[in-house]
Amino acid sequence: MSGDARKTAEGLAYLSGFGNEHASEAVAGALPEGRNSPQRAPLGLYAEQLSGTAFTEPRAHNRRSWLYRIRPSAAHPAFTRSGNGTIRTAPFNQAVPDPNRLRWNPLPVPGPATDFVEGLWTLGGNGDATQRTGMAVHLYHATASMDRVFSDADGELLIVPERGGLLLRTEFGLLHAEPGHVALIPRGVRFRVQLLDEDARGYVCENYGAPFQLPDLGPIGANGLANARDFRAPVAAYEDDESTPGPVEVVNKFCGNLWTAEYDHSPLDVVAWHGNHVPYVYDLRRFNVIGSISYDHPDPSIFTVLTSPSDTPGLAGVDFVVFAPRWLVGEDTFRPPYFHRNVMSEYMGLIEGAYDAKAEGFVPGGGSLHNMMSAHGPDRETFDRASAAELKPQRIDDGLAFMFETRWPVTLTPQAARAEHLQPGYDDVWQGLERHFRPLH
C-alpha cells in the first residue's frame, strides 16, 4: 500500500504481444546465445525449462519458457499439507447442480491481515482438476499484501480486479493490474500479490483445461476483438536472497489442496528468460467491440476476449467475455441482451457501473449464475424501457461487465449455496412481465 509500490507499478516497462516468443534479461549477458542449456549458463545461473503443454503438442499450441535463475526450482525441502481455507477444487461433488438463477452481493469484508491466497473464496465450477478439464469461479477480497509466494499446478489463473490495484511479482517480472485490467498467470508460475490500495477485491477464473488463447476471428477478418499487441508481458526482474535474507513460505496448489514449504531463498530469482509460457496483463478498455450497424443484437460470442478450447471445435471449456463500452445503433431492434436459454453456463460479474440488461441488484463485486438452459434476460424495468425507447444512437459507457462461459454446468460449493450474501428472490426480477399478446383475429 506504499507510495513506492504504486510508483514502481506505474513505471513498469513491458513486452508486447499475446503468444509471442518473448525474451528478456535483467542483467546484460544473462541470456545464452544460440542454445537453451549450455554447459555453463551465463553469469553462474541455472538453466531450467517450464513446460505449460506436453512436449509433443502442435507447435501452434505449444507453451514453454526457459528460465535462467540463481537457484534451480528443485532446490527446496519437502512440501507439507496446509489448510485449504475457502478454496475448493473440482470435482465439486458436495452439492447437487442447481438449475435456479442465482445472484450474490460482494464478499463480506475480511479480517485486517488477509492476503490474496487467504482471501480466495470458491463459488463453484465443473470438470476435474486432476484430469485437466473444467474450471472454477473464485472471488477474492484481500486486506494485506503477500509475504509468501503462490503457484497453482491445477490450472492457469485469470485475475479480474474490481476494486484496488495489484502489483504482481512473478518469476518473469512485475505486472500492474488495476480495475478494468485482467492478469493471466499461467499454470505453475510462482507469484506474489502486493496491494496498491487499502484493500483489493475481484474475481478469478481458474482454468483447468487447455491454456487460454485468442479466439479465431472468422469473417471478422485479421483484426478486432482483443488485439494480440495489447497484451503486455513483464520484463525480467529478480529477487536475490543476499539482499532479502530469511526463509520464504511457498504455497503450492496441487490437486485441490494447498501444500507449503519453507525455502531458504526467494523462488522469484529468475534473472533472464525466453519463451511463450508467460504471464500477461490486458486493459479491457482496449477491446475492439464488434456489433451490428443494421439490426438485431448479435450473439454475445462477439465479446470473447480469450477462449480455452475443448476437444470439440467451437465448444469452449471456458470463454472469457467482456461487455465493454460501445455504441448501440440497431434499427427496429430491442437493444439490450435478448431473452435466452443457453447450452452453455454463464457466470457474470460487474467491474464498474451498471449492466444494460439489469436495472438494479447486479452490483460491482457481485455476480450472477445462469446454468445451462436456465432462462434469463432483461428484467421488467429494462424490457419496458427498451421496448419504448427512441431508437437514436446510444453510447453504453457507464459499465464494465464480464462473463465466464463454460460448456459444463457450474456446481456450487456449499459455502456459496449457503452464503449470507446470496440474494434472496432473484427470480422476482422477471415477475410482472405482462402479457402483451393480442391476436389479430
Curated annotation (Swiss-Prot):
- Role: Involved in the catabolism of homogentisate (2,5-dihydroxyphenylacetate or 2,5-OH-PhAc), a central intermediate in the degradation of phenylalanine and tyrosine. Catalyzes the oxidative ring cleavage of the aromatic ring of homogentisate to yield maleylacetoacetate.
Please name the taxonomic classification of the source: Bacteria, Bacillati, Actinomycetota, Actinomycetes, Kitasatosporales
Cite the InterPro entries for this sequence: HgmA_C, HgmA_N, Homogentis_dOase, Homogentis_dOase_bac, RmlC-like_jellyroll, RmlC_Cupin_sf
What molecular functions are annotated in GO for this chain? Answer: homogentisate 1,2-dioxygenase activity; iron ion binding
Write the protein's name: Homogentisate 1,2-dioxygenase
The annotated subunit structure for this chain is: Hexamer; dimer of trimers.
Q: What are the required cofactors? A: Fe cation
User: Could you tell me what reaction this enzyme catalyses?
Assistant: homogentisate + O2 = 4-maleylacetoacetate + H(+)
Write out the similarity annotation: Belongs to the homogentisate dioxygenase family.
Does the record carry Plastid as a key word? no
Return any one Pfam family short name. HgmA_C
The keyword DNA damage belongs to this UniProt entry's keyword annotation: no
Q: Which residues are listed for homogentisate binding in this entry?
A: 355, 376
Q: What is its EC number?
A: 1.13.11.5
